Amino acid sequence: MEEYVIYTDGACLGNPGPGGWAAVIIQRGTNEKIISGREADSTNNKMELLAVIKALESFEQKGKRVTVYTDSTYVYKGITAWIESWMKNKWRNSSGGAVKNKEMWVRLHGIAAAHTVRWLWVKAHNGDHYNEIVDRVARKEAASFTNCEPE
């Protein structure tokens, strides 16, 4: 089984505001590919989710062994701890409110189920090479709406 490592990040200038996402997909021992995109009106959490979704959807075949690194506690806890309860509780959170970004969570859950995924959280802005790359690309995507460079 082919093994991949994915680093993802999302950024938003304002919340809501212009957003960008990025992922680097590393096939062990062979190559790296960076994918990215933007939305004119989004939130940081949507961009974080979209980065992971787009990275996993980029595989043409199911059944990949993937390690996903995210610096988003929202994504990490959502997919590893909260989603099963949300589904069991008809997409209600622990406070009884509707889960935000439900459609994106459903999409992520479905695509992740097609692969063997290990989820890992990485501290942001802590010198991790690939995390820094996706952070820079995501911020650049978000900034492209304002014709300014991110800080």
Curated annotation (Swiss-Prot):
Record keyword Electron transport present: no
Keywords attached to this entry: Cytoplasm, Endonuclease, Hydrolase, Magnesium, Metal-binding, Nuclease
GO biological process terms held by the UniProt record: DNA replication, removal of RNA primer
Gene Ontology terms: cellular component: cytoplasm
Gene3D superfamilies reported in the protein's UniProt record: Ribonuclease H-like superfamily/Ribonuclease H
Reactions it catalyzes: Endonucleolytic cleavage to 5'-phosphomonoester
Superkingdom: Bacteria
Protein name: Ribonuclease H
Organism, as annotated: Neorickettsia sennetsu (strain ATCC VR-367 / Miyayama) (Ehrlichia sennetsu)
